[in-house]
C-alpha cells in the first residue's frame, strides 16, 4: 500500500535532486555477491563471443538488474548444467543501448553479426536487457555443461543461493579461483 503513495521521483525532486549514478553509489552494497543466471533459449556461443548475458525484463528477467559490476556469475542452462563463470562488467541496460567489441570497434549489439542469428531475431528488442560479463572459465558448447546430483538450480533468471555448495562444486569443476 505504501508503494502506491510513495513517489520516489517526487521525493527526489523535493530533496534537491540527484543523478541515478549518485543514487546507485549511495545504496551500493560493496560486498561482492555470487549469482546464478539461467540462460535457456538464448545463444550461448554469442554470449561467449561478445561477453554478455541477457534476459527479457518481464517476469523474473528483471532480476538481472540486481547484479552489480564485480559480482560473480555462474551461468546455467536447464537440461545442460553450468556452462561458465564470469565477472559482471556492466549494469543491465536495454538491448538498444548495449555495445560489444567487433574487430576492436565498439558496436551496438543490434548491429553485431551473431553466430546464431535466429536466436538474436527471437529477442524482443524493447524488453531484452544485457549485462557485460568477463568470462573467466567456460565451455564452448551447451552439451559440455556440468551438473551433478544434489546441485541446486531455481527457475528464475538471476538469483543468489543461500547454500554455496553448488557454486563451490562448479568453481572446483572449472578450476576457478576468484581473484583477490
Give residue ranges: language-model regions:
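Contiguous surface segments at macromolecular interaction interfaces
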Residues: 1-34, 58-59, 97-180
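Short, surface-exposed beta-edge/turn micro-motifs
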Residues: 32, 69-73, 82-83, 128
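Short, basic/aromatic beta-hairpin or loop at an interaction surface
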Residues: 38-54
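Short, flexible beta-strand-to-coil junctions
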Residues: 39-42, 76-81, 136
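Short alpha-helix capping/helix-loop boundary micro-motifs
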Residues: 54-63
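Short coil-to-beta transition motif at edge beta-strands of beta-rich domains
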Residues: 63-77
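Beta-strand cores of modular interaction/reader domains in eukaryotic scaffold and signaling proteins
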Residues: 74, 87, 132-134
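Short beta-strand-centered aromatic/proline hotspots
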Residues: 82-92
Amino acid at each position: 500500500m505504501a508503494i502506491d503513495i510513495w513517489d520516489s521521483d517526487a521525493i527526489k525532486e523535493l530533496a534537491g535532486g540527484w543523478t541515478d549514478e549518485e543514487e546507485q553509489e549511495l545504496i551500493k552494497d560493496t560486498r561482492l555477491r555470487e549469482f546464478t543466471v539461467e540462460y535457456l533459449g538464448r545463444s550461448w556461443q554469442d554470449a561467449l563471443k561478445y561477453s554478455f548475458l541477457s534476459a527479457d525484463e518481464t517476469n523474473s528477467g528483471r532480476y538481472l538488474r540486481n547484479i552489480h559490476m564485480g559480482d560473480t556469475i555462474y551461468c546455467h542452462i536447464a537440461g545442460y548444467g553450468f556452462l561458465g563463470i564470469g565477472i559482471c562488467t556492466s549494469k543491465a541496460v536495454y538491448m538498444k543501448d548495449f555495445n560489444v567489441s567487433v574487430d576492436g570497434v565498439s558496436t551496438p549489439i543490434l548491429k553485431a553479426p551473431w553466430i546464431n542469428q535466429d536466436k538474436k531475431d527471437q529477442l524482443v528488442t524493447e524488453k531484452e536487457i544485457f549485462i557485460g560479463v568477463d568470462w573467466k572459465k567456460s565451455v564452448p558448447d551447451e552439451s559440455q555443461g556440468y551438473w551433478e546430483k544434489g546441485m541446486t538450480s531455481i527457475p528464475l533468471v538471476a538469483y543468489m543461493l543461500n547454500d554455496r555448495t553448488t557454486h563451490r562444486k562448479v568453481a572446483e569443476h572449472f578450476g576457478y579461483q576468484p581473484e583477490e
